[in-house]
């Protein structure tokens, strides 16, 4: 069993995989050192981070990862292996020589002694309009020039010191576009350059704890007043317009003799003379379906005589819309209903039954003219 034991890998064999942690040959170590650090060094091995003597003299950030300044223990696979950069997170000094270009995401690498210094490096939670209002409100005469506003922002908020072009343009745009800031020309006896900017007294209520409301309060007041005026107008116009809207409906309801133009809910019940017409129509339809042939002439219902001749011709059988009938009292054979018949022979217009009240349709089911009932298959 001992013949199968493999020897441990030698350090030179690991050099291609881990060239930056001190396992490369001397010539490779010198190559990396000369590439990243042009200055000459006496030996390839330097003191570790704990000494701290040569860290501040090399501002190159590549030194942390590829340079020989960090000499951690060799990388050995196993549960007790040392981390790749064990001492980089224990440094008690800034890792970069200058902190002027750091953003908010890099603040975790810096030793911040107090919260005041931290607030100097982050953006203040105020809009540009609020900054302008604070600057003007803090002035003795309640007015400032553009350069004085710049100076106030830069002195009180060091965050804006690193880049002046962007926020200064925003200050100018807010002064020009916001109605709360008024331009006041200089007096003739006042030497200097540029006009003064003041704050409109009506806009002081638009600032809540230094934050500008962006005209929300004023717009809401205007919208509420306009809405109340519109409501008053509609209320005043309702008594005048309501009779006009109800009169045409009354005229339509009264003009329809049989309730043909109005809805079934508003129609009065039809006269009882319509029932014999419907019974005669249904009896003739039953006789036609049970005894007639599909090739016979179309069905004509002479029972619908109260209508004029032209109306009777329209209501007899228009063959436009399909509204079949079932549950006929005289129907006895279900096999005749299953016979294929032309739809234009059995279908009829919905205007025939529109003359009658809906309670007549309770005994009329229109699902069996072309389709057989259940249990009547031949």
From Swiss-Prot:
Localization annotation: Nucleus
Major location category of this protein: nucleus
GO biological process: anatomical structure morphogenesis; cell differentiation; embryo development ending in birth or egg hatching; inner ear morphogenesis; positive regulation of transcription by RNA polymerase II; regulation of transcription by RNA polymerase II
GO CC term (a single one): nucleus
InterPro entries the record matches: Fork_head_dom, FOX_domain-containing, TF_fork_head_CS_1, TF_fork_head_CS_2, WH-like_DNA-bd_sf, WH_DNA-bd_sf
Key words of the record: Activator, DNA-binding, Nucleus, Transcription, Transcription regulation
Gene Ontology molecular-function annotations: DNA binding, bending; DNA-binding transcription activator activity, RNA polymerase II-specific; DNA-binding transcription factor activity; DNA-binding transcription factor activity, RNA polymerase II-specific; RNA polymerase II cis-regulatory region sequence-specific DNA binding; sequence-specific DNA binding; sequence-specific double-stranded DNA binding; transcription cis-regulatory region binding
Cited Pfam families: Forkhead (PF00250)
Keyword Endoplasmic reticulum among UniProt keywords: no
Stretches for region Disordered: 1-26, 208-278
Disulphide linkage map: none
Tissue localization of expression: Expressed in kidney.
SMART domains in alphabetical order: FH
Source superkingdom: Eukaryota
DNA-binding region: 123-217
Compositional bias ranges of the Polar residues kind: 236-248
Role: Transcriptional activator required for the development of normal hearing, sense of balance and kidney function. Required for the expression of SLC26A4/PDS, JAG1 and COCH in a subset of epithelial cells and the development of the endolymphatic system in the inner ear. Also required for the expression of SLC4A1/AE1, SLC4A9/AE4, ATP6V1B1 and the differentiation of intercalated cells in the epithelium of distal renal tubules.
Name of the protein: Forkhead box protein I1
Organism: Homo sapiens (Human)
Gene name linked to the record: FOXI1
């Amino acid at each position: 069993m001992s013949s199968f034991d493999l020897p441990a890998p030698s350090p030179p064999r690991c050099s291609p995989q881990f060239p930056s942690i001190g396992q490369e040959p001397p010539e490779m170590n010198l190559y990396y050192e000369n590439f990243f650090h042009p200055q000459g060094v006496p030996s390839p091995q330097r003191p570790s981070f704990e000494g701290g003597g040569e860290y501040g003299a090399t501002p190159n950030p590549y030194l942390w990862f590829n340079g020989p300044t960090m000499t951690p223990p060799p990388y050995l696979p196993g549960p007790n292996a040392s981390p790749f950069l064990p001492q980089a997170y224990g440094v008690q000094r800034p890792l970069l020589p200058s902190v002027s270009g750091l953003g908010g995401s890099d603040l975790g690498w810096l030793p911040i002694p107090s919260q005041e210094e931290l607030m100097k490096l982050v953006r203040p939670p105020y809009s540009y309009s609020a900054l302008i209002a604070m600057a003007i409100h803090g002035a003795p005469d309640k007015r400032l020039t553009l350069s004085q506003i710049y100076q106030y922002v830069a002195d009180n908020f060091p965050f804006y010191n690193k880049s002046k072009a962007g926020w200064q343009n925003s200050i100018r745009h807010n002064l020009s576009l916001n109605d709360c800031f008024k331009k006041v020309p200089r007096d003739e006896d006042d030497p200097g350059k540029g006009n003064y900017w003041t704050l409109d007294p009506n806009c002081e209520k638009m600032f809540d704890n230094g934050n500008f409301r962006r005209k929300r309060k004023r717009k809401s007041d205007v919208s509420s007043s306009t809405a109340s005026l519109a409501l008053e107008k509609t209320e005043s116009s309702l008594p005048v317009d309501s009779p006009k809207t109800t009169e045409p409906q009354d005229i339509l309801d009264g003009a329809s003799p049989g309730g043909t133009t109005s809805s079934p809910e508003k129609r009065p019940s039809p006269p009882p003379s319509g029932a014999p017409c419907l019974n005669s129509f249904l009896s003739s339809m039953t006789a036609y379906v049970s005894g007639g042939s599909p090739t016979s002439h179309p069905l004509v219902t002479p029972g619908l005589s109260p209508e004029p001749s032209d109306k009777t011709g329209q209501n007899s059988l228009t063959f436009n819309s399909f509204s079949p009938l079932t549950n006929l009292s005289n129907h006895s054979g279900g096999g005749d209903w299953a016979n294929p018949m032309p739809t234009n022979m059995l279908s009829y217009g919905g205007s025939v039954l529109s003359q009658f009240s809906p309670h007549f349709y309770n005994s009329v089911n229109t699902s069996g003219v072309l389709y057989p009932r259940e249990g009547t298959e031949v």
